[in-house]
């Protein structure tokens, strides 16, 4: 009988053990036998008007103070208002989810029956409620879906936990946490993002990028790109005041909305910006959101409560037993939450989630885009798993109001959940492991069990 040398024996045993461990994984990777049991769609509001007015009669910030030429007008007046095209795009997206969820078996096509299994919640502003209603009209066009929301001035603890009194924000800690990410030298951001600031200035003051010498600031105008970037105490909307970076973000905010809303090319950055140019400039806006909402301390304060309710909702669906703090009831199959990009950024940071879609910078929460959490069950093992993805219309799909089908879907990317995702193409995460990841991530003092 041939006897293996000792070292070869050990190596053989290791290979055999590895094969046994990987066997189920490889099988699961090649055949997806899971069935969708519940989905949580956490989306951003649709395309809107800018957050600042073009002009103001008295004191106060206005967009035209930042630019040589007047900012273009949108088809609808007002600040932070859902545009008609924005609403249309939300209905298109809702229609796509209708197709997908019907294919997956969560919807039957009988809207009056399916309505009983849908829970929809929106932060209490006209922009966000309007987005939710438009999405619902695509998801269940023949039903009148109730949009759950808090009536202002009451704050929704899911989306505004600090204002609602659920979470406490230590502003000094927030300043320290952000300052720590910048090495105590926030003005270094101006050097790191010099190309973006240079492009921003050329667009706002209407001269070719790269022109030398650089023109002086027009009389009576504010050069937001020269305002010092600092870290100081902010408010509940922007917990940390980042000085010039916040001013730049406000000035460039209209550009992505101009493009996505379908304004003529001559009115998108006054004809100076393509989709690629907007994406480059928006690295400044994205950096602001990253510091304000993806900083770990801030994510824990601002997003622990919504995360707690979402996890409880999944557990309730998996067990079939009512659970305190869960959204909907044990039979709820579809949960739609609509808020802002700040909310999505915070939740993503809490779980260390990242994504990248064509035409966008990393981790961008695009207008109407959504983090999607699928609760699925293996038909062979009965195990529940969580599958995460990010879904969004591309900039051109938004601009052109492109119809969506299963054959021509929005852009999407699977999202890896650190701490529990396995090495398959969809980064599946066993529900039990996801619950443990959530327990480690959620700051219990910033979460409650109320709806």
For each of these PLM feature ranges, what is it?
Residues 3, 27-29:
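Enriched but not universal
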Residues 3-16:
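Bacterial N-terminal signal peptides that target proteins for export
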Residues 14-24:
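Bacterial N-terminal signal peptides
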Residues 29-117, 123-335, 339-451:
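Signature for phosphate-centric chemistry
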Residues 2-3, 20-22, 249, 441:
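Compositionally biased non-globular segments, especially hydrophobic aliphatic-rich helices
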């Amino acid at each position: 009988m041939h006897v293996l040398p000792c070292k070869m024996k050990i190596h053989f045993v290791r290979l055999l053990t590895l094969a046994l461990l990987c066997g189920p994984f490889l099988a699961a990777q090649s055949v997806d036998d899971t069935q969708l049991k519940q989905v949580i769609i956490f989306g951003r509001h649709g395309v809107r008007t800018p957050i600042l007015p073009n002009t103001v009669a008295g004191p106060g910030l206005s967009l035209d103070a930042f630019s040589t030429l007047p900012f273009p007008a949108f088809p609808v007046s007002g600040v932070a208002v859902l545009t008609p095209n924005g609403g249309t795009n939300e209905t298109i997206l809702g229609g796509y989810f209708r197709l997908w969820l019907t294919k997956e078996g969560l919807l039957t096509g009988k809207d009056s029956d399916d309505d009983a299994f849908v829970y929809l919640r929106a932060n209490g502003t006209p922009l966000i409620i309007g987005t939710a209603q438009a999405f619902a009209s695509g998801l269940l066009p023949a039903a009148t879906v109730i949009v759950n929301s808090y009536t202002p001035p009451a704050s929704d603890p899911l989306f505004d936990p600090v204002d609602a009194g659920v979470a406490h924000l230590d502003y000094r800690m927030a300043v320290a946490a952000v300052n720590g990410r910048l090495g105590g030298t926030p003005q270094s951001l101006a050097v790191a993002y010099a190309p973006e600031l240079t492009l921003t200035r050329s667009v706002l003051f209407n001269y070719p990028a790269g022109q030398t010498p650089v023109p002086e600031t027009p009389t009576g105008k504010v050069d937001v790109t020269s305002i010092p970037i600092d870290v100081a105490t902010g408010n509940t909307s922007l917990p940390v005041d980042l000085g010039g970076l916040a001013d730049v973000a406000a000035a460039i905010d209209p550009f992505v909305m101009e493009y996505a809303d379908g304004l003529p090319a001559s009115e998108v950055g006054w004809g100076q910006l393509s989709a690629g140019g907007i994406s480059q400039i928006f690295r400044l806006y994205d950096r602001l959101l990253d510091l304000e909402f993806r900083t770990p301390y801030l994510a824990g304060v601002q997003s622990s409560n919504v995360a707690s309710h979402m996890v409880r909702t999944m557990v309730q669906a998996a067990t079939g037993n009512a659970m305190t703090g869960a959204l909907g009831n044990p039979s709820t199959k579809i949960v739609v939450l609509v808020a802002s990009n700040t909310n999505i950024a915070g939740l993503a940071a809490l779980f260390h989630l990242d994504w990248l879609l064509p035409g966008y910078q990393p981790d961008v929460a695009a207008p109407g885009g959504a983090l999607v959490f699928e609760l699925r069950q293996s038909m062979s093992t009965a195990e529940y798993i969580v599958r995460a993805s990010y879904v969004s219309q591309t900039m051109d799909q938004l601009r052109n109001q492109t119809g969506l089908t299963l054959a021509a879907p929005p852009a999407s990317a699977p999202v890896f959940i650190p701490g529990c995702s396995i090495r398959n193409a969809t980064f599946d995460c066993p529900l039990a492991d996801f619950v443990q990841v959530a327990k480690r991530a959620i700051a219990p003092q910033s979460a409650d069990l109320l709806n």
